[in-house]
């Protein structure tokens, strides 16, 4: 069988392999493109809890408070490491199993004076606020304030019915945007002073990508067959806000703050999103996906999302042979030590080397967020940010779409 640069057939993980692993999430591979590398700043990281009070409960009816635990990365002059806590998700007959891993952020380090542009980072179902540390830390090191939430009832340790994530993921993101505009109530003053006043970027994986698109104006399809994905019959009542695309005046007012979306294997194009409603999305949008994605779908899932985003400047980057796991950190050492295939496969792809995939996700995300600044980056292998080198042309494909002439530009 011929070898493919950046791609590999994985053998089952060896329990002894973890002993030799020294790389941390976000450390670039030797073949990383230029924008995949860390930036000039050190990174601080802190944890904060906020509450979105009195929210509709699509599971039990009534109202409840949604407590969001936030991990916040920011530019600092400190360099250090910190221990993050996560868990492997539960499976039938097996409870979630906690583990720890190390990141290159200095815990509670003093921030560098801002203001800094803001990136919201949204995990999938299930996921966690530290699932994409490989992306959060380098973005902060390049001068961005990165905020990732544990979305209630959607995490490895707090996994609830899918209908709750369908209803609340866009609402959580709109709430975070409103919280930012309110001055980060509950945050330390030094942290509250960091966000700039520009448009926000939302980077979301799977259900995080779904949430970003719906927060920016898309709607749920009333003809969707959500029963096929485990949503109870009678879901249209509990999901009325995402069917209407209306969440109340305060949340809806935050929609215009979204200037850029990076959707990583976004879910819903095949199963849930009203494709015609994507014309309402005005945010610049980058879609990153594998053409072997069996969860979100490719030709019948993410490609239709790209084609219906007529109101937005957009790009579609396809990793050929990649499945759904385009966004997570590499499998943690705890998965190698346990030898549990399910724990390993929650993070890994069957074909792509996870560090090479991480490199490409970071590179294209930075290229899209930084625009002209990133376009100037070059190396012998990458003459420009969007020029795929010959060695990867069989593995990568890039499409570009322009907004309709009547659509406003958000820069």
Whereabouts are the PLM-identified features?
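Alpha/beta-hydrolase-fold serine-hydrolase catalytic core, especially in secreted/extracellular enzymes
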Residues: 10, 15, 23-24, 30, ...
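Short substrate-entry loop that stabilizes the transition state in hydrolases
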Residues: 107-116, 121, 125-158, 294-298
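Acidic catalytic loop of the alpha/beta-hydrolase fold
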Residues: 269-270, 292-296, 324-325
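Domain-level recognition of soluble alpha/beta enzyme cores
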Residues: 15-119
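Short glycine-enriched nucleophile-adjacent loop
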Residues: 178-181, 209-221
């Amino acid at each position: 069988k011929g070898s493919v640069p950046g791609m590999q057939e994985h053998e089952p993980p060896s329990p002894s392999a973890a002993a030799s692993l020294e790389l941390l999430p976000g450390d670039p591979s030797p073949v990383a493109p230029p924008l995949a590398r860390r930036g000039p700043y050190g990174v601080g990281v802190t944890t904060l809890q906020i509450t979105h009070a009195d929210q509709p409960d699509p599971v039990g009816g009534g109202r409840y408070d949604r407590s969001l635990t936030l991990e916040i990365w920011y530019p600092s002059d400190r360099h250090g490491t910190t221990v993050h806590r996560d868990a492997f998700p539960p499976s039938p007959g097996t409870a979630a199993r906690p583990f720890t891993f190390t990141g290159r952020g200095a815990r509670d380090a003093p921030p560098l004076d801002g203001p800094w542009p803001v990136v919201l980072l949204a995990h999938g179902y299930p996921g966690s606020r530290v699932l994409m540390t490989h992306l959060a830390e380098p973005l902060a090191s390049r001068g961005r304030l990165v905020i990732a939430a544990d979305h209630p009832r959607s995490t490895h340790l707090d996994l609830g019915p899918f209908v709750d994530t369908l209803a609340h993921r866009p609402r959580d993101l709109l709430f975070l945007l409103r919280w930012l505009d309110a001055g980060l109530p509950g945050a330390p003053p030094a942290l509250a002073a960091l966000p700039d006043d520009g448009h926000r970027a939302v980077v979301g994986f799977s259900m995080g990508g779904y949430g970003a698109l719906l927060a920016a104006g898309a709607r749920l399809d009333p003809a969707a067959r959500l029963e096929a994905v485990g949503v109870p019959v009678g879901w249209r009542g509990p999901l009325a806000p995402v069917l209407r695309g209306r969440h109340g005046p305060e949340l809806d007012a935050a929609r215009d703050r979204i200037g850029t979306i990076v959707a990583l294997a976004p879910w819903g194009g095949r199963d849930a999103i009203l494709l015609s409603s994507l014309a309402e999305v005005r945010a610049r949008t980058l879609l990153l996906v594998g053409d072997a994605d069996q969860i979100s779908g490719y030709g019948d899932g993410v490609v239709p999302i790209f084609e219906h985003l007529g109101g937005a400047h957009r790009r579609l980057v396809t990793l050929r042979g990649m499945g759904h796991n385009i966004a997570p950190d590499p499998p943690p050492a705890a998965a190698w030590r346990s030898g549990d295939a399910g724990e390993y496969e929650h993070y890994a792809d069957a074909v792509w080397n996870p560090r090479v995939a991480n490199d490409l996700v970071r590179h294209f995300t930075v290229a899209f967020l930084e625009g002209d600044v990133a376009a100037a980056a070059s190396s012998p292998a990458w003459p420009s940010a969007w020029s795929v080198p010959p060695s990867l042309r069989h593995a990568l494909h890039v499409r570009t779409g322009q907004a309709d002439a009547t659509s406003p530009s958000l820069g």
